Structures are given as structure tokens and as C-alpha cells.
From Swiss-Prot:
Biased composition annotated in UniProt, kind: Low complexity: 356-370
GO biological process entries: base-excision repair; DNA replication, removal of RNA primer
Protein name per Swiss-Prot or TrEMBL: Flap endonuclease 1
Main localization (coarse): nucleus
Subunit structure: Interacts with PCNA. Three molecules of FEN1 bind to one PCNA trimer with each molecule binding to one PCNA monomer. PCNA stimulates the nuclease activity without altering cleavage specificity.
Span list, region N-domain: 1-105
Organism from which the protein derives: Lachancea thermotolerans (strain ATCC 56472 / CBS 6340 / NRRL Y-8284)
Family: Belongs to the XPG/RAD2 endonuclease family. FEN1 subfamily.
Length: 385
């Protein structure tokens, strides 16, 4: 689910923390990718023209395999070395969120039964998409045959991605879940595994600049995330992004905020959930269950060509000519290796407050200018009234 409203806070207060780039700008980078999130995207997006998921002759879904194969090839074509990270057992504190998701699925299943229009049916079918253990195992097999490393996290994949980035094993964590920032990844990449056809730039969020711009410690940022709403507990009812940021700046900790609300001094519309486990949620972000980065050895190797063809073509029904062509791209990309980047020879100094304020003002001005220009576009040759 991620953290509700965090994007809006970043856009409003620290736009300079986000850099929008083309995929080619990450040449030479190793990246840890949230596999479960990626597989979910592929199962929803990789479909036939009629909107139906890709499937083998035996009826097995293959959208996830096509997504992994071709989106990974695109990364390798652009000099990126990906490592996929798979979810382990969810923490007990997440059971409430998982129960809510199950309830939503049951409601969607009922709506699907009642749907008449084909478009309505497809909409509900997409909402019912779920990554199964079988999907995960097939994805792992494909990655092994492609010669690419993957890590099985003991718990949350985003936390493990962040740990690999903190340990210097990879440059960044890649996920659509904003709560990855609460696990203290130095950099978060969003939209990395999106389709090229979407023409969506990759968003690179710099955690150091983000915290500096918000003037929050990592502990306060985590408290902000919990207050906005995360997978581990409900949020404070009636408190939105603007109010949450104001409260954390004024009161510094969730303990103080809860005391302030329950003392009767605050807005009586705000309601702290009963037995709110915010301390336990905070601890899951500060000390997640992960394999230490120093213990992980990531290796990229030659693809097993014939075994890969047997799996993808003979077993799953993909076109052999296209798969072999993809294998050649894979071999070429992996032989290139991770070349040195010019910025690797320099240490970038963090911005001071004045520089950060100027960068944020420039980012806001650019955004406002684009919106104003967009609003003034009219039909050519027709005078304005």
C-alpha cells in the first residue's frame, strides 16, 4: 500500500528531492528491485489486445514471465544490473492490513459476478490480481536461467532492498511503495519497471535531501509515515498530510502527538485508534527483519541458453526466435559489465539550507511554469477572446 499522501508532501515542500531521469542515466548502476511489486504490475499490465492475461496452451498465466524477461532486458540494454528481492513472511503487525485486503477482494468478486459490460468485468478482474507462490517460484526459475541474482527476504522485500542499498551492494532500491524511504534507503527509484510505451520518466528520490528539506530526523519521518497511514497500523482519523506534517514539526514525536490529542487540547474531530500500535510499527521500520547486506553476495553470470529456451518456449509457449534474440541481448549486456561512472570519482556534498531552499524554489517555479503553459495552449490560428 505504501504511505498515503507522502508524494503530495514531497511535491509541495521538497521537490528538489526528486530527480526525473531517463533509464539511460542509470548506466553502470546496480539496483535492488521489489519483485512482488513488479510481478503485480506485470500481471495487471502485460495482456493481450482484448485485455486478457497471457497464458500458455495449458491455460497457465505467463504475463509475469514476459514482464520479467523483457523489462529486465530493457534494464540490461541500458547498463543496469538488476537484483530482484522477494517477500518473505509478512510481520504479524501486517495481518490487519491483509485482512482488509481480503475483505476488499470478496467485495470485488461479488461486483465481478454482477458486472455485465466487458469493460466493467476487466476492471474488477484487474483488482483481483494476486501474486501467488507459483508466480514467485516461476520468476525465480527464470532469473536463475537468465544468470541474474535474487534475494529471498526473511520478511518485507522493500526493507531488504533498502538494506542492500545502505550496505553499498546496490545503488538504490526500486519500488512503487513509498514506505521504502522509511527503511532508510539512500535512493528510491520509482517507475523503473514500467513499460517503455508509457514514456514515464524514472523518479529518483534522494532520502538525505528529503529529510534535510523537511527538517526532520529519520525517526520523525517514520512517525510522519505512520501518522499518514502505512501497512502496519491505521492512521489518526481526521489528520491529513498537511496537518500530519505540522503536528510532527510542532510536537516532534508520536508519543507527544497522542498525548496532545487525548488531552483535549486538539481538534475534537481527530481520533487516535484504540490500542494504536505505533511504537511497534516504528520499530519495524527502524529494525526490520533482513539479511545483513554484508552477508549477501550478488553475482551476475552467463545465461543458461538451452535451459532458458526449454522453459520459456517448450514449457510456457513463448516464441523461440524472440527468446533467443533476447538471450543475445542479455549476453551482450552482461559482458559489458558495470563500467565506472564519472560521478563515482567525486563525493557530492549535501546542500546547505540556502542552497536547498533555492533548489526547491526553482523546482516549484518550473512546475508552475509548465502548468501555466499547459493551460494556455489553444487551437492554432484562432485569436483569443
Amino acid at each position: 500500500m505504501g504511505i498515503k499522501g507522502l508524494n503530495a508532501i514531497i511535491s509541495e515542500h521538497v521537490p528538489s528531492a526528486v530527480r526525473k531521469s531517463e533509464i539511460k542515466n542509470f548506466f553502470g548502476r546496480k539496483v535492488a528491485i521489489d519483485a512482488s511489486m513488479s510481478l503485480y504490475q506485470f500481471l495487471i499490465a502485460v495482456r493481450q489486445q482484448d485485455g486478457v492475461q497471457l497464458a500458455s496452451e495449458s491455460g497457465e498465466t505467463t504475463s509475469h514471465l514476459m514482464g520479467i524477461f523483457y523489462r529486465t532486458l530493457r534494464m540490461i540494454d541500458n547498463g543496469i544490473k538488476p537484483c530482484y528481492v522477494f517477500d518473505g513472511k509478512p510481520p504479524v503487525l501486517k495481518s490487519h492490513e491483509l485482512s482488509k485486503r481480503s475483505a476488499r477482494r470478496a467485495t470485488t468478486e461479488e461486483k465481478l459476478k454482477e458486472a455485465v459490460e466487458e469493460a466493467e468485468k476487466l476492471k474488477h478482474e484487474r483488482r483481483l490480481v494476486k501474486v501467488t507462490p507459483e508466480h514467485n517460484e516461476e520468476a525465480k526459475k527464470l532469473l536463475r536461467l537468465m544468470g541474474l541474482p535474487y534475494v529471498e527476504a526473511p520478511c518485507e522485500a522493500e526493507a531488504q532492498c533498502a538494506e542492500l542499498a545502505k550496505a553499498g551492494k546496490v545503488y538504490a532500491a526500486a519500488s512503487e511503495d513509498m514506505d521504502t524511504l522509511c527503511y532508510r534507503t539512500p535512493f528510491l527509484l520509482r517507475h523503473l519497471t514500467f513499460s517503455e510505451a508509457k514514456k514515464e520518466p524514472i523518479h529518483e528520490i534522494n532520502t538525505e535531501i528529503l529529510l534535510q528539506g523537511l527538517e526532520l530526523s529519520i525517526e520523525q519521518f517514520i512517525d510522519l509515515g505512520i501518522m499518514l497511514g502505512c501497512d502496519y497500523c491505521d492512521s489518526i482519523r481526521g489528520v491529513g498530510p498537511v496537518t500530519a506534517l505540522k503536528l510532527i514539526k510542532e510536537h516532534k514525536t508520536l508519543e507527544n502527538i497522542v498525548e496532545y490529542i487525548e488531552s483535549g487540547q486538539a481538534n475534537n474531530k481527530w481520533k487516535v485508534p484504540e490500542n494504536w500500535p505505533f511504537k511497534e510499527a516504528r520499530q519495524l521500520f527502524l529494525d526490520p527483519d533482513v539479511v545483513k547486506g554484508s552477508e549477501v553476495d550478488l553475482k551476475w553470470s552467463e545465461p543458461q541458453e538451452q535451459e532458458l529456451v526449454d522453459f520459456m518456449c517448450k514449457e510456457k509457449g513463448f516464441n523461440e526466435e524472440r527468446i533467443r534474440s533476447g538471450i543475445k541481448r542479455l549476453q551482450k549486456g552482461l559482458k559489458t559489465g558495470v563500467q565506472g561512472r564519472l560521478d563515482g570519482f567525486f563525493k557530492v556534498k549535501p546542500k546547505n539550507k540556502e542552497q536547498l531552499a533555492a533548489a526547491n524554489a526553482k523546482a516549484k517555479s518550473t512546475k508552475a511554469g509548465k502548468q501555466a503553459t499547459k493551460g494556455k495552449v489553444g487551437k492554432p490560428g484562432r485569436p483569443r477572446k
